[in-house]
Swiss-Prot record:
Cofactor annotation: Mn(2+)
Protein's UniProt keywords contain Plastid: no
Family recorded in the similarity comment: Belongs to the arginase family.
The EC number(s) this enzyme carries: 3.5.3.8
Organism the protein comes from: Aeromonas hydrophila subsp. hydrophila (strain ATCC 7966 / DSM 30187 / BCRC 13018 / CCUG 14551 / JCM 1027 / KCTC 2358 / NCIMB 9240 / NCTC 8049)
Source superkingdom: Bacteria
Keywords: Histidine metabolism, Hydrolase, Manganese, Metal-binding
Record protein name field: Formimidoylglutamase
Recorded catalytic activity of this chain's protein: N-formimidoyl-L-glutamate + H2O = formamide + L-glutamate
Record pathway: Amino-acid degradation; L-histidine degradation into L-glutamate; L-glutamate from N-formimidoyl-L-glutamate (hydrolase route): step 1/1
Length: 314
């Protein structure tokens, strides 16, 4: 098996409504394979990160490696409302548990896509995907401007990397790399569950200057305040990387994750925030993490993940 697999385009199939012509197109009609030669016109490039090694190391429930394929299958039959090309750039795999190598391959792929003018949308995989995604953006920018990371997540994912990286360490790894480079670590974590993060993690977040909002404060009534806070954060940044850990959503909406949320944040709050981030014109890269098809119920979680893909790029 190749370490970077082109996806089987047969996954992109679904309903046909020929009686309605061009207005009845779905994703399976429009998603394009990556060209074998030459450059593709700038568009959205889907990249799968078929890896849950970080989840295993973090003592979570594995299965997220199957997420990229499952999300593609749900996207395939979704109605098409986009005005730019979408390409399937295949999957990065984690072979023999070598997460560092998988991170390196993802970073290389993301950087190259950015260099060629595309918007990479990475489909994880465990949240270890974040270090690979950010590393690609960091490589592409090469110090040009300040990067802000916005993470919708019930967890800070600021665990210290002792012997190995995991799904709990990506933002600590990024903070370490920023310190080495002498660049600011600008991180927002929105939807934090107090009971899912130790006092040590809250202290580390404070020491690193992380802007965080608890899940209980992320309600429709608080949306104006959230948008104001987001504006202040975005104003400090030249470029944005948005990462969505799907366990930020309520367990009833998102059962298919390793650590379902006891409370979570509603889509009615998250979607306007995504739209606001997009409207800033600074969003360069996004990813989804932690969807686990083996824990899903009637594809409920996959449908939500597919909806969020649409929200990220519409």
């Amino acid at each position: 098996m190749d370490k970077f697999n082109p996806v089987d385009m047969s996954v992109w199939q679904g309903r046909q409504d020929p009686e309605d012509g061009e207005l009845a197109l779905r994703w399976h009609d429009k998603v394009q394979p990556w060209p074998q030669a030459g450059r593709a016109a700038p568009g959205v490039a889907l990249v799968g990160f078929a890896c849950d090694e970080g989840v295993r190391r973090n003592k979570g429930r594995v299965g997220a490696a199957g997420a990229p394929l499952a999300v593609r299958k749900l996207l395939a039959n979704s109605a098409w409302h986009l005005g730019r090309p979408v390409y399937d750039r295949g999957d990065v795999n984690c072979e023999d548990g070598d997460l560092d190598a998988a991170h390196g391959r993802l970073a290389e792929r993301v950087a190259r896509l950015l260099d060629e003018g595309h918007f990479p949308l990475v489909l994880g995989g465990g949240h270890e995907v974040a270090f690979g995604s950010w590393s690609g953006l960091n490589r592409h920018l090469a110090g040009r401007g300040r990067v802000g990371i916005i993470n919708f997540d019930a967890h800070f994912d600021l665990r210290m990397k002792l012997e190995q990286a995991s799904s709990g360490t990506p933002f600590f790894q990024i903070a370490e790399q920023c310190a080495i480079q002498g660049t600011p670590f600008t991180y927002a974590c929105l939807g934090v569950a107090e009971t899912a993060n130790t006092q040590a993690l809250f202290a580390r977040a404070e020491a690193l200057g992380v802007w965080h909002v608890l899940d209980e404060a992320m309600t429709p009534a608080e949306l104006p305040a959230l948008l104001s806070g987001l504006d202040a954060f975005i104003a400090r940044c030249d470029h944005l990387y948005l990462t969505i850990d799907l366990d930020v959503l309520p367990a009833a909406v998102m059962p298919g994750v390793s650590a379902p949320a006891a409370r979570g944040v509603e889509l009615a709050v998250i979607e306007p925030l995504i739209a606001h981030i997009r409207a800033s014109g600074k969003l360069r890269l996004a990813d989804l993490a932690e969807y686990n098809p083996s824990l899903d119920q009637d594809n409920r979680s996959a449908r939500v993940a597919a909806r969020l893909v649409h929200q990220l790029i519409k």
